[in-house]
Amino acid sequence: CKLLKEHGHTVIGWDTEIHNETNDITGYCDEYYNIDVTSRAVCGIYDAVVHLAGRSVVPQSLIEPTEYYRVNVMGTANLLEKISTPHVLFASTSSAWEMASPYARSKVAAEDVIKEKADGYTIFRFFNVSGTDGVNHQLGDPTHLIRIAAEAASGRRDKVEIYGTDYETRDGTCVRDYIHVVDLSNAILNAIESGPTNTPYECLGSNTGYSVREVLQTMQEVTGKKLNIIEAPRREGDAVSSVVDTLSKHVTLTKSIEDMCL
């Protein structure tokens, strides 16, 4: 929202305010509404719609699969039924290839809904989004590694757990691709201004994989803090490795893994 406003776009924001204690995008919107993507209140005519709504925590999806299909799939269908726009930009997931969790499967199903119902679309498969633009808009309890490690480095968390150390990777821990939120936001802006691609999907990442141990080591080097690292069993639903093979043409990388740890 902030970047779109800075580039002269009129921004209408929808959110459920689930994370109301820290979520305040109203200052970056010309209009703002507390609306759930599954609600009958969804409506309107727009030049483009950036669909970021949905449930996104893999372990939770294993416990509440029906809720993930309701929000991520039915919510997407509801959105496309109620709005009119020539361009839907959808935030899908890098988990889509292995489909090892209800979360991943719900996102793939939502992709299919968009391909069937949208007049024009750009489907982005987000890899691990990290970092800030210098303003704290982090929502709720952290579920992603870099933010968890940052909390441990700042003393707000007493440990960081590594879930699985016996994977077939260079150091036995899972490997992920990370993209800074600033680079991701610029890619979305570029896509809005370029128009729909109507291709199966595009990848938003960095084309570089980092293991869990490598990320934690980088956090320690950047912050100068030693983390209390605990090795734990593998976690159901985790992919061994997830790294971009071909980046979206809309991505220009300006930030490093070190920037994400600041």
Could you say what each language-model-derived stretch is?
Residues C1, I148-L262:
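C-terminal substrate-binding subdomain of Rossmann-fold SDR/epimerase-dehydratase oxidoreductases
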Residues C1-A48, D141:
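N-terminal Rossmann/SDR dinucleotide-binding element
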Residues V37-R70:
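NAD(P)H-binding glycine-rich loop region in Rossmannoid oxidoreductase-like domains
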Residues V49, I63-L89, D112-V113:
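NAD(P)-cofactor binding segment of oxidoreductase domains
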Residues H51, A77-A104, G120-F124:
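Conserved Rossmann-fold NAD(P)-dependent oxidoreductase catalytic core, especially the SDR/UDP-sugar
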Residues Y69, V73, A100-V108, Q138-R147, ...:
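Short-chain dehydrogenase/reductase
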Residues A96-P102, F124-H144, E168-T173:
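Flexible, glycine-rich beta-alpha linker
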Residues A100-F127, R147-R157:
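Active-site Tyr-X1-5-Lys
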